[in-house]
Structure formats: structure tokens, C-alpha cells
């Protein structure tokens, strides 16, 4: 399961980049989506790698994101009681563990919005014009995406 965060805006970009970000449901900077590891999604991520930060998210970070930033339709916070009543999972932590392991999907909890609206990272991005290998924030973070998501909680 990949966590994908939009880091750069789409002004003066090619139409196909904008369309791919729209297909990934990334409409604003600092929004995050959770994407399964399939060839179609990996190709989409590869196309917009210069506008996003992405990597493999772990269960602990995913649980914290769902508790703090998970929203239902109507901008209602996601709670353990709602997850227990409306899905087969016993709570947010159980759902996050299944989601990180690939056994669950976001649609298993009805009414859960697919986009997590995050804060800008505390202490800021390193730079939004360079890749991670060059000392920036763009591109593939691997397991270090959890550090970025923690700063954006």
C-alpha cells in the first residue's frame, strides 16, 4: 500500500499530468491518498513522480492518519465505534493493520472519504524542486514516507 502526497501545484503543467493527478484524486497540495500496489497505479505514480511524494506506509502511521485525518461524508470524524458498527473490523487499529497488509480496501468502511487532507509538514519541506536523492521532498521515499506523514499529521 502506497501513501501518495501532492507536494507541488499544477499551474503551467501538461494536461496529461493534471489528468493523472485528477485520476489519483489529488486536487490540492498536501492531500494524501492511499493507493494499492498494482501495475496500473504504479504507472500513474511514475508519470507524476515530479509532483508527489510517495512510499510504503506502515500500520502505525496509517492508524494515526485515520484517527486524526480520516473523515466520513459530511466532514464527520472517523471513530472506532463507526468502524465497528459498519464493517467487519473491530476498530481503526484493526482496519489500519489490514489496510497496510493489503487485505482491506478503503471502501470496506462505507462513507469513508478516500482523500486525507493533511497539514503542511512541521519544519517545512526540504525543498519542493528536488527529488529525495538530491536532498529534496519529491519522488520515492520508501519507508521514510512515514516520517513525512508524521510531520504532516
Swiss-Prot record:
Cellular component, GO annotation: cytosolic large ribosomal subunit
Gene Ontology BP terms: maturation of LSU-rRNA from tricistronic rRNA transcript (SSU-rRNA, 5.8S rRNA, LSU-rRNA); translation
GO MF entry, a single one: structural constituent of ribosome
Domain of life, source organism: Archaea
Cited Pfam families: Ribosomal_L30
Keyword Amino-acid biosynthesis: no
InterPro entries found in the cross-reference section: Ribo_uL30_ferredoxin-like_sf (IPR036919), Ribosomal_uL30 (IPR039699), Ribosomal_uL30_arc (IPR005997), Ribosomal_uL30_CS (IPR018038), Ribosomal_uL30_euk_arc (IPR035808), Ribosomal_uL30_ferredoxin-like (IPR016082)
Keyword annotations: Ribonucleoprotein, Ribosomal protein
Signal peptide per UniProt: none
UniProt KW Protein transport keyword: no
Cross-referenced CDD domains: Ribosomal_L7_archeal_euk
PANTHER family per UniProt: 60S RIBOSOMAL PROTEIN L7, LARGE RIBOSOMAL SUBUNIT PROTEIN UL30
HAMAP family noted in UniProt: Ribosomal_uL30_A
Assigned protein family: Belongs to the universal ribosomal protein uL30 family.
Subunit comment: Part of the 50S ribosomal subunit.
Protein name: Large ribosomal subunit protein uL30
Source organism (scientific name): Methanospirillum hungatei JF-1 (strain ATCC 27890 / DSM 864 / NBRC 100397 / JF-1)
Taxonomic classification: Archaea, Methanobacteriati, Methanobacteriota, Stenosarchaea group, Methanomicrobia
Gene: rpl30
Amino acid at each position: 500500500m502506497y501513501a501518495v502526497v501532492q507536494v507541488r501545484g499544477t499551474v503551467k503543467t501538461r494536461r496529461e499530468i493534471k489528468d493523472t493527478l485528477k485520476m489519483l484524486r489529488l486536487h490540492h497540495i498536501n492531500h494524501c491518498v492511499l493507493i494499492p500496489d498494482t501495475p496500473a497505479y504504479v504507472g500513474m505514480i511514475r508519470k507524476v513522480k515530479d509532483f508527489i511524494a510517495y512510499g510504503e506506509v506502515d500500520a502505525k502511521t496509517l492508524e494515526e492518519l485515520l484517527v486524526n485525518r480520516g473523515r466520513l461524508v459530511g466532514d464527520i470524524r472517523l471513530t472506532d465505534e463507526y468502524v465497528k458498527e459498519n464493517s467487519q473490523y473491530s476498530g481503526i487499529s484493526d482496519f489500519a493493520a489490514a489496510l497496510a497488509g493489503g487485505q482491506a480496501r478503503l471502501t470496506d468502511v462505507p462513507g469513508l472519504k478516500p482523500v486525507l487532507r493533511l497539514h503542511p509538514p512541521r519544519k517545512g519541506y526540504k525543498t519542493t524542486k528536488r527529488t529525495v536523492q538530491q536532498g529534496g521532498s519529491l519522488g520515492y521515499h520508501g519507508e521514510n514516507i512515514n516520517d513525512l506523514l508524521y510531520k504532516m499529521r
